[in-house]
Amino acid sequence: MIAAQAKLVYQLNKYYTERCQARKAAIAKTIREVCKVVSDVLKEVEVQEPRFISSLSEIDARYEGLEVISPTEFEVVLYLNQMGVFNFVDDGSLPGCAVLKLSDGRKRSMSLWVEFITASGYLSARKIRSRFQTLVAQAVDKCSYRDVVKMIADTSEVKLRIRERYVVQITPAFKCTGIWPRSAAQWPMPHIPWPGPNRVAEVKAEGFNLLSKECYSLTGKQSSAESDAWVLQFGEAENRLLMGGCRNKCLSVLKTLRDRHLELPGQPLNNYHMKTLLLYECEKHPRETDWDESCLGDRLNGILLQLISCLQCRRCPHYFLPNLDLFQGKPHSALESAAKQTWRLAREILTNPKSLDKL
């Protein structure tokens, strides 16, 4: 048993060195290329409208606010200033979303974003995004990379296609620190010892982002309340939780396996599903010794089995917002074929670790 475990860990480490590191290097190269173009577009936006200041900056060889969706798809979060005159209202009526309401006694004119406030006093995510989209469209025509960058039409999101190969979504957002959403109040679970109180305090201080992007209800049609609402995002908090042990190595292997074998019609699975299931695995195995390098095979196996279970149940709850289902709106047939493909992959890795050489 221990010999089989050791063999799997050896093969996974080899896979990490050969496949995952190559993936990381290729993505890092793409990011540099993509960020040059995006920075140029945002610089042009800022000239037209100084309220949209580019926050895309490189710190320690990684870009602040950039999320890798897949090797050819990225999201850049553009942090906006001055949320101060608004209250954060999170009543759970729209899973995964919240609204920003003008504080009592505050005049509209005190806000930097006065023309985007609705009659009922909400700061509209949709109105801000619509204005930003117009500015980006103009900037794309003027910027020095105009030959290689195009706006993607037929969406209310701000999406650029670069060199016909890459897609970058630019999302206006507010950073919320020092508060924690009511819809995430059940975290951390009282009976689960992970993460410890110090890490919990760090994560809550880190806060979350409010993004201006489409949030669909079950019908797929947006109500006006939804289009004014902001989407909650916990990227930095999640990254902080995954520090230590073999957690990030495990995530890297999962992402590489997804990119190579689970990129399926209907796009049932993305890297965020992998990250979410890794966080649940951390709760199931709360001790740091469970995340020793020697346990990499067990942890990976546990996550793949959990993924199959979620795909079969057609439900994958968000880690911080359990009322939000990350499979919502995905075609059932796509989830079914992903479950079968994940099962084949898990069986292959477990019964024949050497197969990782070919995966």
Curated annotation (Swiss-Prot):
Species whose genome carries this gene: Homo sapiens (Human)
- State which disorder the record connects to this protein: Microphthalmia/coloboma and skeletal dysplasia syndrome: A disease characterized by bilateral colobomatous microphthalmia or bilateral anophthalmia, associated with skeletal dysplasia in some cases. Additional ocular findings include microcornea, cataracts, corectopia and nystagmus. Intellectual disability is present in some patients.
Q: What does this protein do?
A: Required for several aspects of embryonic development including normal development of the eye.
Q: What compartments host this protein?
A: Nucleus; Cytoplasm
Q: Which SMART domains match?
A: Mab-21 (SM01265)
Keywords tagged on the record? Cytoplasm, Developmental protein, Disease variant, Microphthalmia, Nucleus
Single GO biological process annotation from the record: cell population proliferation
State the family named in the UniProt similarity comment for this chain. Belongs to the mab-21 family.
Q: Which cysteines are joined by disulfide bonds?
A: none
Chain ranges passing through the membrane: none
Superkingdom in the source lineage: Eukaryota
Tell me the organism's taxonomic lineage.
Eukaryota, Metazoa, Chordata, Craniata, Vertebrata
A Gene Ontology CC term for this entry? cytoplasm
Name of protein: Protein mab-21-like 2
Alphabetical list of InterPro entries matching this protein:
Mab-21-like_nuc_Trfase, Mab-21_HhH/H2TH-like, MAB21L/cGLR
Q: Which gene encodes it?
A: MAB21L2
User: In UniProt terms, what is the effect of altering residue 51 to C?
Assistant: In MCSKS; complete loss of ssRNA-binding activity with the variant protein; shows a higher stability than wild-type in tetracycline-inducible cells
Q: What is the effect of changing residue 51 to G?
A: In MCSKS; Decreased stability; does not affect subcellular localization
